[in-house]
C-alpha cells in the first residue's frame, strides 16, 4: 500500500520535482522494510503499567475519557470517583496507540523522502553513467595522438625550410601513425576498464545505500518512556492503592479535580514523547539522506574521478608523446635532410621506433601498476635512446639502442601503414631510394654495417666524427654521463632543446610562430608547449630564480650558451635559407650581451614575457623598502600595493616610497628630477587609443598611478565600448572592493596636447587611474590560473566583450558570503591604520560627505565615502574628484552619495542613498536595493 503522502505545505519545490524519480524496485522495498522494522513502538510501557491498573478495576473501555470536575456535584456517590479513575486509565491506555499512530505518519513521511532521495540519486547515476560511456566512446573514436600532433605540425613547419621541411614532411606522418597504433592499445585498455567500473557502479551503490540506511535506523527505537507519563501512572496507582475512591473524607469534586490534573499530565507526557521521537527521527532522516548522498559521491569519485583523470592524462600523455616525436624530427631535420636520409634513414627509423614503443610501454606499465595514466617525463621519453647505451657516448638524440637483431623492430610493421608507407609517399616528394640527386655524398664507414643495421644515433655519430655532415646540429663530447641526473644538462633531447630554445628566444616572433608580444604571455607557441610539458633543464635558472631583475635574454646570452654553441657546426653554404644553419643555433652569430640587452630594455618597448614561473619576492622583505627605479624590471613586474595582512606597514610595498610619491606629482614640480617620466607628464600623456603602451606601462618608471586606497589584487582589461573587464583572484581579496575600488568610466580626451595643469575635470588622473588600476605582478603565484576566479585563454590577445564577465559578478558575491567573517576581521583590524597611513602619505583630502554621520578631520581619517579627492600639491586649484563607481558594468543612473565636485562642504544631495557610515548602499543581486550587509554585520569603517 502506498504510504500516506505528507501535506503539500511540508513539501518544498525540490521535493515536488523529486516525486517523479523512483529508485530501483529492490531499493524501494528494502527502504520500506527497514523503516517498518525500526520504527515500531516499544510496548514495554503497556506491559508494565496497564496490568497494574487493571488490578484495581480502573480500565473500562466504555467509560468516558472527558470527566470535568465542574460536572461533579458535591456529595455525589463514589460511582463518579470510579468513572473518573477509569477515564484516567483509558487515557494511559490510549497513549500507546496515539504514539504509534503519530510515528506511523512520521514513518510514512521518512519513507517517502528517503525513496525520493534514492530515486533522484538513481536518476543522476543513470545520467552520469550514460555520459561516462559516451565519453569513453568518443575517446576510442578519436585518435588522440593524431589530434595532438596536428596542433604542433604548423608551428614546426614554420621553423623549417627547404630540405629540412621536406625531411619533416616525410617523417611526421610515418612516425605519428606508428605511434598512434601503439598508443591506441593503451586507450582501449583504459576505456575497457573504465566501462566495467561504470557498469558496476549502480549495483555497488545500491547495496551501499541500503546497508547505510539499515545501520542508521537500527538505532532508531520509539519509546513510550517519559518522566511525566511515569509520574502520572504512578500517581493513579497510588490513588487506587490508598482507596481514595472509597474514602468518604475525600469529596467527589476534589477527587475529580485531582484526576483531571493527572490526565493533563498524562497528555503532556504523550505530546512530549511524540515530539521527542519525531525530532530524533528527523535527525536520523537527515543523516540518512546525507549518507546516501555521500555514498553516491564516493561511488562517483571512484568511477568518474578515475575516468576523468585517465582521460585527461591520456590527452596530456598524447600531447607529450606527439610533441616529443615531432620535436625529435625537427632537431634532426637539419642533420638528416635528403642528402643524408638515403644512407641513415633506416637507422633513424629504428631509433625512433624503439623510442615510441618504449614510451608507450612505459605508459601502460604505469597504468598497470597504479591504475592511473601518468604523463611521461623527459627522462622516460629519452629512455628509448639511452636505455641500452653501451659506450656511454651521446649525440644529438643521445645514446644507442641495442644494435642486436633482437632489439631492432621489424621495419615491415612500420612500412605497412597504408598511405604512409615508405614506398608510396616518398615518390610524392622526391625520387625513390635509387635517386642520384646527391651523388657526391660520401658513405660513412660504419663498422659492422654488414652484420646489422646501425641505429640512427650511431650512424650519425660516425658521420659527425668524419666531418661528412656540415649540417649536423651538434655532437656532444664523448663523456661519462654519470647517471640520469647529468642527462638533464648535457645529453639527448635536453641539450638539443637548450639550443633550440636559444635560437627561438633570439629569433623574431614573426619568423617562427605568429603571436603578439604585448600581452605578457607567450609569443611563441613552441616554447609555451615545451615548457608546458615539463621540459625543464639545469639551464632554466631564469625561470626558477627568486630575483625578478634578471632578464631572460641577458641570461641566455651570458650563461653557459657558449659551451653549448661550441658544439654547433655552422652551415653558411646556403645563404638563401634562413634556417640553413643548425636548427638549434641562432640565425646569426650569437650576439654578445651588450648587443642583446638594449633592445629588450628600451622604455616603451614590448619585451617578451614568458609564462615560466618565477617565485614572488615577498612583500614583507625589508630589502624592498629602498628599491630604486633602475632596479625594477621594466615590463614584467608592476606595482603591487596589496595589503594582504592587517598589520602591513608603508614600506612593505613592492616599490619604494620615492617612486610612489613621484608617480602622483605633476610635471610642473621643478624640484623633482624625474618629472619628465611621470605618468602625468605632458609629453607622456596617455589615451585609451594607446592601449598597447598603457597596458604594458613601459613608458612609466612608476608603472602606474598609486591609489591611496586599501588595495586588493585585481586585473583590469580593456573591453569593447570602453568597458573594463575585471579579473579577481580567489584569495587575498576583500569584500569592500565594491565600495572603495570603483573606477569612473569617464570619457578620455583624445587630444595629444591636453595640459595636465588645466585638467580640471581630472580626466588625466582618472585615465591613469583606470589604466593602472591596481597593477599586479603577472608572474605572482596568486595569479596562477587555479587561483583566478574568471580567466580567458590568451586574455591579452583579444578585446573582451562586456557580456563575457557576467559570471564573475555572481561568483564574487558567493565568495564574499562564504568568507564574510574572515573578511570582517580584516576590515576591522586592518583598514583604519593602513588607510590613515596612505592618506597622510599622499595628502588625500577627504570631503565631509554625509556630515551627520561622519566626524572626520582633513587628511586624518580615511574617506569612507565612495568619493576620494586626489590633490597633487602643485596644482593649487580645485582638485578633481575621482567618482569611483561600483564597477564599469554598473548602471549609470545609480544615485551616488556625492557627485563629481571638489567642494568639501557640499552635503549629500540624496540622503536615502547614504548609509549610517556614509557609504553608498551596496547593491547585491537578489537583495532589496537598500540592503547593506555592512550596516547589519560589519563594523563601520
Swiss-Prot record:
Residues 606-626 have a biased composition (Basic residues). Pfam families: HHV6-IE. InterPro entries: HHV6-IE (IPR005507). Residues 14-23 have a biased composition (Basic and acidic residues). Residues 1-23, 567-632 are annotated as: Disordered. Residues 567-584 have a biased composition (Polar residues). It comes from the Viruses. This is Immediate-early protein 1. It comes from Human herpesvirus 6A (strain Uganda-1102) (HHV-6 variant A).
Amino acid at each position: 500500500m502506498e504510504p500516506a503522502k505528507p501535506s503539500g505545505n511540508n513539501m518544498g519545490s525540490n521535493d515536488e520535482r523529486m516525486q517523479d524519480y523512483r529508485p530501483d524496485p529492490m531499493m524501494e522495498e528494502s527502504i520500506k522494510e527497514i523503516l517498518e522494522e525500526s520504527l515500531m513502538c516499544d510496548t514495554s510501557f503497556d506491559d508494565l503499567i496497564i496490568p497494574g491498573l487493571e488490578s484495581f478495576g480502573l480500565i473500562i473501555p466504555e467509560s468516558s475519557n472527558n470527566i470535568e470536575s465542574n460536572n461533579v456535584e458535591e456529595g455525589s456517590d463514589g460511582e463518579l470517583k470510579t468513572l473518573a479513575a477509569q477515564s484516567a486509565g483509558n487515557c494511559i491506555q490510549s497513549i500507546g496507540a496515539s504514539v504509534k499512530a503519530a510515528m506511523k505518519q512520521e514513518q510514512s513521511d521518512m519513507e517517502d523522502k528517503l525513496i525520493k532521495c534514492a530515486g533522484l540519486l538513481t536518476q543522476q547515476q543513470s545520467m552520469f553513467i550514460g555520459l561516462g560511456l559516451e565519453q569513453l566512446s568518443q575517446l576510442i573514436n578519436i585518435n588522440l595522438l593524431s589530434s595532438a600532433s596536428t596542433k604542433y605540425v604548423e608551428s614546426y613547419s614554420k621553423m623549417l625550410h627547404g630540405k629540412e621541411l621536406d625531411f619533416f614532411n616525410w617523417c611526421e606522418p610515418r612516425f605519428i601513425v606508428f605511434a598512434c597504433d601503439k598508443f591506441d592499445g593503451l586507450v582501449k585498455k583504459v576505456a575497457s576498464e573504465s566501462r566495467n567500473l561504470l557498469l558496476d557502479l549502480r549495483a555497488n551503490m545500491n547495496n551501499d545505500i541500503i546497508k547505510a540506511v539499515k545501520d542508521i535506523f537500527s538505532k532508531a527505537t520509539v519509546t513510550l518512556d517519559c518522566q511525566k507519563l511515569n509520574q502520572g501512572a504512578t500517581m493513579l496507582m497510588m490513588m487506587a492503592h490508598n482507596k481514595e475512591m472509597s474514602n468518604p473524607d475525600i469529596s467527589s469534586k476534589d477527587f475529580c479535580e485531582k484526576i483531571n490534573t493527572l490526565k493533563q499530565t498524562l497528555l503532556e507526557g504523550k505530546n512530549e514523547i511524540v515530539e521527542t521521537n519525531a525530532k530524533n527521527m528527523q535527525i536520523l532522516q537527515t543523516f540518512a539522506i546525507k549518507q546516501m548522498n555521500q555514498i553516491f559521491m564516493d561511488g562517483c569519485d571512484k568511477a568518474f574521478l578515475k575516468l576523468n583523470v585517465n582521460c585527461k592524462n591520456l590527452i596530456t600523455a598524447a600531447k607529450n608523446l606527439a610533441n616529443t616525436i615531432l620535436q625529435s624530427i625537427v632537431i634532426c631535420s637539419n642533420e638528416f635532410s635528403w642528402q643524408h636520409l638515403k644512407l641513415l634513414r633506416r637507422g633513424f627509423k629504428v631509433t625512433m621506433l624503439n623510442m615510441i614503443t618504449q614510451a608507450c610501454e612505459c605508459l601502460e606499465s604505469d597504468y598497470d601498476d597504479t591504475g592511473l595514466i601518468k604523463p611521461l617525463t623527459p627522462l622516460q621519453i629519452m629512455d628509448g635512446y639511452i636505455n641500452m647505451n653501451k659506450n656511454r657516448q651521446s649525440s644529438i638524440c643521445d645514446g644507442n639502442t641495442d644494435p642486436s637483431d633482437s632489439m631492432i623492430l621489424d621495419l615491415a610493421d612500420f612500412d605497412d601503414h597504408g598511405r604512409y608507407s615508405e614506398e608510396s609517399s616518398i615518390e610524392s616528394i622526391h625520387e625513390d631510394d635509387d635517386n642520384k640527386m646527391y651523388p657526391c655524398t660520401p658513405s660513412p664507414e660504419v663498422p659492422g654495417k654488414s652484420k646489422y643495421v646501425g641505429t640512427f644515433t650511431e650512424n650519425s655519430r660516425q658521420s659527425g666524427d668524419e666531418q661528412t655532415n656540415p649540417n649536423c646540429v651538434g655532437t656532444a663530447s664523448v663523456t661519462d654521463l654519470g647517471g640520469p641526473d647529468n642527462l638533464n644538462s648535457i645529453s639527448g633531447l635536453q641539450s638539443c632543446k637548450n639550443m633550440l630554445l636559444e635560437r627561438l628566444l633570439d629569433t623574431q616572433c614573426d619568423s617562427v610562430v605568429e603571436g603578439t608580444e604585448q600581452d605578457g604571455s607567450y609569443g611563441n607557441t613552441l616554447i609555451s608547449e615545451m615548457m608546458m610539458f615539463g621540459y625543464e633543464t639545469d639551464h632554466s635558472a631564469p625561470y626558477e630564480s627568486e630575483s625578478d631583475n634578471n632578464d631572460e635574454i641577458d641570461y641566455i646570452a651570458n650563461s653557459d650558451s657558449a659551451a653549448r654553441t661550441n658544439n654547433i657546426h655552422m652551415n653558411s653554404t646556403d645563404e638563401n635559407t634562413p634556417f640553413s644553419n643548425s636548427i638549434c643555433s641562432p640565425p646569426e652569430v650569437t650576439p654578445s650581451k651588450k648587443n642583446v640587452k638594449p633592445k629588450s630594455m628600451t622604455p616603451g618597448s614590448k619585451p617578451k614575457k614568458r609564462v615560466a614561473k618565477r617565485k614572488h619576492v615577498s612583500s614583507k622583505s625589508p630589502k624592498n623598502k629602498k628599491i630604486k627605479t633602475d632596479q625594477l624590471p621594466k615590463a614584467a613586474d608592476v606595482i603591487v600595493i596589496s595589503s594582504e595582512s592587517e598589520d602591513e606597514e608603508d614600506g612593505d610595498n613592492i616599490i619604494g616610497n620615492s617612486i610612489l610619491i613621484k608617480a602622483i606629482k605633476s610635471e610642473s614640480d621643478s624640484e623633482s628630477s624625474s618629472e619628465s617620466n611621470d605618468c602625468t607628464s605632458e609629453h607622456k600623456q596617455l589615451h585609451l587609443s594607446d592601449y598597447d603602451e598603457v597596458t604594458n606601462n613601459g613608458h612609466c618608471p612608476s608603472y602606474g598611478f598609486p591609489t591611496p586606497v586599501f588595495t586588493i589584487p585585481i586585473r583590469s582589461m580593456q573591453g569593447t565600448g570602453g568597458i573594463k573587464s575585471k579579473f579577481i583572484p580567489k584569495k587575498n581579496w576583500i569584500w569592500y572592493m565594491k565600495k572603495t575600488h570603483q573606477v569612473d568610466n569617464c570619457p578620455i580626451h583624445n587630444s595629444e596636447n591636453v595640459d595636465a595643469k588645466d585638467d580640471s575635470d581630472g580626466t588625466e588622473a582618472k585615465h591613469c587611474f583606470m589604466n593602472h588600476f591596481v597593477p599586479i605582478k603577472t608572474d605572482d603565484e596568486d595569479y596562477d590560473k587555479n587561483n583566478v576566479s574568471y580567466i580567458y585563454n590568451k586574455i591579452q590577445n583579444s578585446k573582451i566583450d562586456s557580456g563575457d564577465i557576467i559570471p564573475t559578478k555572481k561568483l564574487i558575491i558567493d565568495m564574499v558570503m562564504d568568507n564574510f567573517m574572515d573578511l570582517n576581521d580584516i576590515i576591522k583590524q586592518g583598514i583604519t591604520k593602513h588607510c590613515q597611513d596612505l592618506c597622510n602619505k599622499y595628502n588625500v583630502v577627504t570631503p565631509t560627505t554625509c556630515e551627520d554621520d561622519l566626524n572626520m578631520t582633513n587628511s586624518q581619517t580615511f574617506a569612507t565615502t565612495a568619493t576620494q579627492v586626489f590633490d597633487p600639491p602643485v596644482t593649487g586649484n580645485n582638485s578633481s574628484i575621482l567618482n569611483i563607481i561600483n564597477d564599469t558594468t554598473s548602471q549609470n543612473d545609480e544615485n551616488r552619495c556625492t557627485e563629481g565636485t571638489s567642494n568639501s562642504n557640499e552635503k549629500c544631495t540624496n540622503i536615502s542613498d547614504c548609509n549610517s557610515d556614509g557609504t553608498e548602499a551596496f547593491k547585491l543581486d537578489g537583495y532589496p536595493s537598500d540592503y547593506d550587509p555592512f550596516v547589519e554585520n560589519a563594523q563601520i569603517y
